[in-house]
Amino acid sequence: MKVFLVTCLGFAVFSSSVCVNINILQQIGYIKQQVRQLSYYSQSSSSYIVVKLLPNIQPTDNSCEFKSVTQYNKTLSNLLLPIAENINNIASPSSGSRRHKRFAGIAIGIAALGVATAAQVTAAVSLVQAQTNARAIAAMKNSIQATNRAVFEVKEGTQRLAIAVQAIQDHINTIMNTQLNNMSCQILDNQLATSLGLYLTELTTVFQPQLINPALSPISIQALRSLLGSMTPAVVQATLSTSISAAEILSAGLMEGQIVSVLLDEMQMIVKINIPTIVTQSNALVIDFYSISSFINNQESIIQLPDRILEIGNEQWSYPAKNCKLTRHHIFCQYNEAERLSLESKLCLAGNISACVFSPIAGSYMRRFVALDGTIVANCRSLTCLCKSPSYPIYQPDHHAVTTIDLTACQTLSLDGLDFSIVSLSNITYAENLTISLSQTINTQPIDISTELSKVNASLQNAVKYIKESNHQLQSVNVNSKIGAIIVAALVLSILSIIISLLFCCWAYVATKEIRRINFKTNHINTISSSVDDLIRY
């Protein structure tokens, strides 16, 4: 008895609901690549981050004057001044100018936007709406500036307004402040200049799009990651509550920032962070597959199945995920993009090879091998598979669609001149002999489809010709059938007439015989009566 492993992410309950048989699919060139958890997200709330761009430096015993800080402050002012002016033009349009627009009671400086799309105007509305919180946070600028903590919560009463962050302060606190009294002023100034220069380079990279228009160019969280530096995990943890790791959320780009205020005197920047609401569907898995060519019916073919499958319990759907954000372990979507699979496709996913459909390929570059967990799955009938250690050619039999090469078969493998080191064993316990009918192979290439359509048209024309001939024959058969029906009806009527005549004759014969018998009895009685009368007279 053959025993094989069915790697299945769900459990079959109904006959039309089956689980994915990854081992069988691998043997026909359909290889599982990645499994991700499906989550849905929507932008629902906001948080604020105060970025403190000028660090606090403790006074030294030598009363050093750091020229690098003065130069850094001057350069930073030149960088932030256009941003501050642009925000002020959008948030506070001139009362004497008529070129401003109101959206739901909010005044927006249209001239500052330039040529803006609907999405950009929406961003400007968001910027204006955030000014109330920005002013409340700016009112506490002195306390923010006085602290030398890298992460500092800005609170008004018991309500947290924002998180004050200074990435460069973390470097100053951990490295520079411990050496202030042990080095000369020149050495400290050079070290500080190096740190501030690197940080300024990152700021220039992050805010370069903002120099054009902050309302039209939101800051991605990847750029904020450079801005926040080592404080990024702490900020994400403080602003977003979810079981998903901060790295997954940041790499997906679900959080975006927008500059809503710049305080030039204190070198502080208030950034509004759009925080998503994330809901994970616990039993929904999105499986990515990688298709390679296979040797089917003496030709190179490829299986016709979608590259991405959604499996919820024991049901499968095609899942393009065109508008989703993918990370290593999660896929974030705003809505469900599932598409229905045919019953044949579901049966094929379950390992029923007779339900699979393949498409022949010729004259085109195809994926003919893939690395899988330290092994190689290759179509060794369409490319040269040569094992170098030990040295021997790898042959793929006709009844195998692909060949799985693991450490037991080869240590160093060459595929058309490319060398690979095999480091793992395959977890497939056996290779099934495949039997695939010719009807399971269809053409999907445009040229092949045109050729097949020409054949179909020729067949249809021949079919029309045969149909006309058969119609003519049927018409002849119909005429003869009418004559035959009349003859049969006449014969039936004649037979019925004969039968009725015979029955009438039999009835007449029996009736005549009965009448004669009655007459005979009557005459006999009359004779006896006459004899009795004669006897009485006598």
From Swiss-Prot:
InterPro entries to which the protein is assigned, alphabetical: Fusion_F0_Paramyxovir
Keyword tags: Cleavage on pair of basic residues, Coiled coil, Disulfide bond, Fusion of virus membrane with host cell membrane, Fusion of virus membrane with host membrane, Glycoprotein, Host cell membrane, Host membrane, Membrane, Signal, Transmembrane, Transmembrane helix, Viral envelope protein, Viral penetration into host cytoplasm, Virion, Virus entry into host cell
Membrane topology: Single-pass type I membrane protein; Single-pass membrane protein
GO biological process, one term: symbiont entry into host cell
Cytoplasmic side: 508-538
Chain segments annotated as transmembrane: 487-507
Complex and partners: Homotrimer; disulfide-linked F1-F2. Interacts with host LAMP1; LAMP2 and LAMP3; these interactions promote the cleavage of the viral fusion protein F.
Record's comment describing the protein's domains: The 2 coiled coil regions form a stable six-helix bundle.
Function field: Class I viral fusion protein. Under the current model, the protein has at least 3 conformational states: pre-fusion native state, pre-hairpin intermediate state, and post-fusion hairpin state. During viral and plasma cell membrane fusion, the heptad repeat (HR) regions assume a trimer-of-hairpins structure, positioning the fusion peptide in close proximity to the C-terminal region of the ectodomain. The formation of this structure appears to drive apposition and subsequent fusion of viral and plasma cell membranes.
Protein name listed in UniProt: Fusion glycoprotein F0
Organism, as annotated: Mumps virus genotype B (strain Miyahara vaccine) (MuV)
